[in-house]
């Protein structure tokens, strides 16, 4: 009898072993209640049906069934966890692949085309307003400037841009044309004339209208919006108070009872007032109306307290850097501690590079440059570490990143962004000067570091460190970076009667190859 029991137990344990081996290949099933597992029910039933088993044998058998069931559940959970992790990993790989494909389709995440990346918000016979897409829609690399939006206003001759206010701080730059800005304070309207090169800051919520006072030419205004809403970064809206059917007045959202009570005017008169305008938000006006909207005298005060008058002309300011090959004018937060530039931590710059000339290769320490080409053609190159992973399919065993060249031809209406620390260079074409205005964000304490010209960062490096960094004699390195042509710059500067101030004269120079390399491609 003992031999039969042992034999039966051996057979049963062989049956359990077979079940264990099937776990790895069986399909995982969710069980809410332990007794509902058919394998567990079958196992326990067979234990009870073995007549040759003693009560002790049956207990051992039932315990083996329970132990097998627990092991099965643990194994199923493990398989489920492994399956979940595998799916998550596959999903991450797909997302990374899609992101990489998206970036490969757009090899210039810092370049914005006029015909591709601007959307038209307003368009009438009198003009249009185009807004550049959010910077983060182009690339996640631009999250730091997500809350800045660039817009371009184009208005035909003798047009009126209806009164509105924005839920954003706005910096206006007059690219071309002659304008009148009407700024509404609590008690009156302050009228300010804008000439080409004028820049002005409009505080958020300030009602304003714009007039193109020129009889023949279009007006082009660049507008940098800095939305003040913390809940929707990078999103700004315009609100029309005066209006009718087109543009629709913001007051139309209120009930007639509320409007009648607030304005103490019957509904009929209110309907007459808010039902007349249907010409759109930009429309032509007569010469007499333009004359009536012009300032009667030159303003000497600013109706909004708390800051100095926020208007200046960057074209007329003395250049920060200038020679026969280019001119850079900067107005920044360090120029006036009480200015709106200080509060917005913003620098405004104007660059004019002479044809067949270039800026030095340089980078900003703190500022992110948002540049708009306003005239001329040229070329841009940026050194970018973020793009290097997709520029090469092979991984190099190195202790430093690789760098990818982002390059683009430049023409009027294009926008490009240069993050801090990224070396870049701009080059004017052979036939015309390259003119750009730049909004430099986070500009406080910003410094420019150059790689070419007098006093560049390599030439300023001490010789021992220079030799260690290049693993090359410092005399040979100095022969490359201590260019002798900056001496020619001094001579040319004297011929042009230009002041010589260290790096300033060597910030711009002609775009020409060394004599031994002339005739080869510059971008080789």
From Swiss-Prot:
Associated with the plasma membrane of several cell types engaged in sucrose transport, including the mesophyll cells of young sink leaves, the companion cells of mature phloem and the cells of developing cotyledons. It is found in: Membrane. Residues 73-102 have a biased composition (Basic and acidic residues). Residues 110-271, 312-478 form the Cupin type-1 domain. Residues 1-29 form the signal peptide. GO terms for cellular component: endoplasmic reticulum; membrane; protein storage vacuole. It is a peripheral membrane protein. Keywords: Membrane, Signal, Sugar transport, Transport. InterPro entries: Cupin_1, RmlC-like_jellyroll, RmlC_Cupin_sf, Seed_Storage-Functional. Disulfide bonds: none annotated. Residues 73-107, 384-404 are annotated as: Disordered. SMART domains: Cupin_1. PANTHER family: CUPINCIN, OS03G0336100 PROTEIN-RELATED. Plays a role in sucrose transport. This is Sucrose-binding protein. The lineage of its organism: Eukaryota, Viridiplantae, Streptophyta, Embryophyta, Tracheophyta.
């Amino acid at each position: 009898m003992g031999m039969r029991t042992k034999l039966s137990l051996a057979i049963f344990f062989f049956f359990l072993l077979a079940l264990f081996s099937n776990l790895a290949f069986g399909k995982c099933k969710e069980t809410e209640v332990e007794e509902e597992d058919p394998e567990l029910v079958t196992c326990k039933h067979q234990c009870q049906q073995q007549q040759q088993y003693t009560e002790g044998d049956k207990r051992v058998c039932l315990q083996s069934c329970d132990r097998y069931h627990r092991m099965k559940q643990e194994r199923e959970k493990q398989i489920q966890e492994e399956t979940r992790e595998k799916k998550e990993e596959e999903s991450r790989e797909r997302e990374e692949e899609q992101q990489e494909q998206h970036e490969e389709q757009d090899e210039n995440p810092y370049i914005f085309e006029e015909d591709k990346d601007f959307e038209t918000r307003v368009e009438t016979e009198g003009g249009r307003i185009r807004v550049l897409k959010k910077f983060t829609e182009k690339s996640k690399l631009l999250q730091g400037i997500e809350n800045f939006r660039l817009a371009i206003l184009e208005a035909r001759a003798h047009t009126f841009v209806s009164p509105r206010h924005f839920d954003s701080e706005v910096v206006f730059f007059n690219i071309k044309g002659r304008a009148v800005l009407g700024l509404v304070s609590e008690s009156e309207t302050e009228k300010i004339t804008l000439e080409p090169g004028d820049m002005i800051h409009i505080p958020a919520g300030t009602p304003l209208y714009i007039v193109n006072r020129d009889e023949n030419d279009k007006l082009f205004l660049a507008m940098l919006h800095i939305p003040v809403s913390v809940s929707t970064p990078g999103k700004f809206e315009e609100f029309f108070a005066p209006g009718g059917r087109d543009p629709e007045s913001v007051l139309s959202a209120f009930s007639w009872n509320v409007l009648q009570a607030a304005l103490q005017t019957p509904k009929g008169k209110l309907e007459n007032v808010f039902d007349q305008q249907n010409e759109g938000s930009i429309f032509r006006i007569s010469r007499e109306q333009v004359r009536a909207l012009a300032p009667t005298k030159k303003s000497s005060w600013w109706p909004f307290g708390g800051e100095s008058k926020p208007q200046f002309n960057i074209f007329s300011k003395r250049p920060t850097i200038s020679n026969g090959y280019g001119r850079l004018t900067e107005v920044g937060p360090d120029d006036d501690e009480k200015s709106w530039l200080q509060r917005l931590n913003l620098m405004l710059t104007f660059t004019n590079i002479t044809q067949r000339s270039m800026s030095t290769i340089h980078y900003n320490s703190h500022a992110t440059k948002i540049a708009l080409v306003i005239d001329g053609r040229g070329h841009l190159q940026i050194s970018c570490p973020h793009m290097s992973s997709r520029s090469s399919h092979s991984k190099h065993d190195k202790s430093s990143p690789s760098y990818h060249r982002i390059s683009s031809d430049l023409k009027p209406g294009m926008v490009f962004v240069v993050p801090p620390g990224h070396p870049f260079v701009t080059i004017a074409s052979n036939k015309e000067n390259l003119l750009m205005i730049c909004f430099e964000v986070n500009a406080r304490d910003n410094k420019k570091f150059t790689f070419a010209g007098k006093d560049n960062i390599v030439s300023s490096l001490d010789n021992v460190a220079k030799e260690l960094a290049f693993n090359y004699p410092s005399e040979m390195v100095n022969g490359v970076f201590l260019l002798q042509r900056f001496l020619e710059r001094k001579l040319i500067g004297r011929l042009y009667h230009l002041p010589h101030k260290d790096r300033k004269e060597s910030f711009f120079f002609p775009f020409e190859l060394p004599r031994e390399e002339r005739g080869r491609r510059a971008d080789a």
